[in-house]
């Protein structure tokens, strides 16, 4: 459990992770526009109980994913809109779709430094997913690592040191897991379609 830095921190239900129907979300950072996002949700009959930005994050993800039925690409675009030069380099048809998404959901788009890690059961496609999304201004870093071999492990953290510490701990429990990942990637922000988010899928 990780307690939030804002909201009703005294209540254990305000701690991470927050869980939707098919996903669990943890969050690093905070929203500058919490009240705007909460108002956006209330207009859709969703009312946060614990006044934390993490809670509204998972409500947003669940709204876009389950209620609206958006594919993951559109969910991420609604949360972290593609910006400026990255937007200009998109194909014209994708620009049209993204512009419509941004216009529809700009008041629900988190503003400020934030970074989500989401564990998701994509039951319709019979797979589990580990997803990392960061704000497109890249105010919070994001590192993804993949350990391959006898045991495949995908990890998303704010820092490489946290990934290495996690692998070291896992290797003490299971010798098939090495202490260093085979590959590391840093998110660059700007656009999830070009390295601004990571998705690790495990087919069921």
What residue ranges belong to the model's regions?
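N-terminal segments that mediate ammonia production and transfer
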Residues: 1-204
């Amino acid at each position: 459990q990780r307690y939030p830095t804002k909201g009703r921190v005294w209540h254990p239900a305000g701690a991470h992770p927050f869980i939707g129907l098919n996903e669990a979300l943890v969050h690093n950072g905070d929203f500058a526009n919490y009240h705007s996002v909460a108002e956006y949700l209330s207009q859709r009959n969703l009312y946060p109980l614990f006044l934390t930005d993490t809670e509204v994050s998972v409500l947003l993800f669940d709204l876009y994913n389950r209620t609206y039925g958006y594919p993951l690409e559109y969910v991420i675009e609604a949360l972290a809109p593609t910006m400026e030069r990255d937007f200009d380099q998109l194909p014209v048809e994708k620009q049209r779709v993204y512009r419509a998404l941004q216009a529809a959901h700009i008041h629900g788009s988190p503003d400020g430094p934030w970074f989500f890690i989401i564990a998701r059961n994509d039951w319709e496609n019979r797979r589990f997913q580990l997803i990392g999304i960061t704000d497109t201004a890249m105010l919070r870093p994001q590192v993804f690592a993949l350990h391959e071999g006898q045991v495949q492990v995908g990890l998303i953290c704010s820092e490489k040191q946290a990934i290495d510490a996690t692998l070291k701990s896992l290797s003490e429990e299971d010798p098939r897991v090495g202490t260093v990942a085979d590959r590391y990637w840093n998110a660059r922000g700007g656009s999830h379609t070009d390295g601004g988010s990571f998705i690790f899928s495990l087919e069921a």
